Amino acid sequence: MTPAPDQLVLRRPDDWHVHLRDDVMLEQVLPATARQFARAIVMPNLRPPVTTVDAAIAYRQRIEAALPDGMAFTPLMTAYLTDDISPDELERGHREGVFTAAKLYPANATTNSAAGVSDLACITAVLERMQAIDMPLLIHGEVTDPDIDIFDREAVFIERHLIPLRRQFPQLRVVFEHITTEQAAQFVVDGDPLMAATITPHHLHINRNAMFQGGLRSDFYCLPVAKRERHRLALRQAATSGDPSFFLGTDSAPHPRAGKESSCGCAGIYNAPYALESYLAVFEAEGALQHFEAFASENGPRFYKLPLNEDTITLKRTAQLVPAQLEGQGLVPFHASEVLDWRLAD
């Protein structure tokens, strides 16, 4: 038996789905993402949402201004699709290198998505243009019909919307973001090279029981919600399989502790500070360390047609206790009060 390594040196990873927020929260959470990742796809669901080239440029400038001295990090900006967004505005942003991709939020599916798309038919011209200019579409894949059980909303979205969309726009590059079900994983496996998916660390670690163990655990509440154990296991198999259609996307979504622990708690898990250590625990447990670099550092940029990072990071087998709360931030990190076996070296 090959002995377990004490150190891993990897091509620097990227995060293909992150919420950096804005203002004070941006300043608090950006260093954690920039420490672990060279680039990140930045979600546009601010208030107001990022729907124009000028808004994306301004947000990118705020991110760059908040970056601590000595840190190298590139934010990759996205456009927030609405029923009336202009195809010309999207094309201009993509041509000028401002918009890396466009994000489809079904209206009212998640945090700050009220201005999202009410019906895919409303954005047919937009999707036609995106397909023509080879601009990736990023999808929050859940239906919002109140008659559909919240645990079934991803699977129903595939049948109602994603399958027809792939048929109508077969040359459109699509990322099915933060997948949570075996149906989603299988849909991507069965798809073509223009279909990919991101997987979060928390959906690899927890199932829906975690939200209710020992009481109501608001820190494990996110959207899409965690599902049954069989879905978690299917995600672990997909992430660690070596299939290039799957890549890292944390969906790190910080909320102040007071916002999480309230009568109407916010959806989102803040996993950025220990994201790589969290993913690595899964790959090691599944006996798939040989596939970790591709998942974290190679599959994403290849799908987005971006260069691979040339610098490296080092992860060492050094146990670390994750704090119950991050000092001075009022944020509870994923794995709070747990011990992780790996540590990202400074």
From Swiss-Prot:
Keywords: Hydrolase, Metal-binding, Pyrimidine biosynthesis, Zinc. Pathway: Pyrimidine metabolism; UMP biosynthesis via de novo pathway; (S)-dihydroorotate from bicarbonate: step 3/3. Its cofactor is Zn(2+). The active site is at residue 251. It is an enzyme of class 3 (hydrolase). One of its GO terms (biological process) is 'de novo' pyrimidine nucleobase biosynthetic process. The keyword Amino-acid biosynthesis does not apply. Binds 2 Zn(2+) ions per subunit. GO terms for molecular function: dihydroorotase activity; zinc ion binding. It comes from the Bacteria. The keyword Lipid metabolism does not apply. SUPFAM superfamilies: Metallo-dependent hydrolases. Substrate binds at residues 19-21, 45, 140, 223, 255, 267. It catalyses: (S)-dihydroorotate + H2O = N-carbamoyl-L-aspartate + H(+). The modification N6-carboxylysine is found at residue 103. Zn(2+) 2 binds at residues 103, 140, 178. Its EC number is 3.5.2.3. Zn(2+) 1 binds at residues 17, 19, 103, 251. Catalyzes the reversible cyclization of carbamoyl aspartate to dihydroorotate. Belongs to the metallo-dependent hydrolases superfamily. DHOase family. Class II DHOase subfamily. HAMAP family: PyrC_classII. PANTHER family: DIHYDROOROTASE (PTHR43137:SF1). This is Dihydroorotase.
